[in-house]
Amino acid sequence: MSIDKKQREKLERLGEHIKTLRKEKGLTLKELSHSINKDPQSIHRLEKGQVNPSYLYLVDLCIGLNIN
């Protein structure tokens, strides 16, 4: 299924926010990926707004970033 422009913009904003949070926590892509057992490339693609993450992926990110 194709993603429209508004959805793409939302994914890009989400990715930017995740990247900002990761950097504020002082984590590299590799460190975050290791802590949540995900591939660093998948997190990179998420931060670039190139993928639509599942709910469980977002839960894992919240745990890895220590977000309540």
Where are these regions (language model features)?
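Short basic helix-loop element that most often maps to the first helix and adjoining turn
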Residues: 16-35, 60
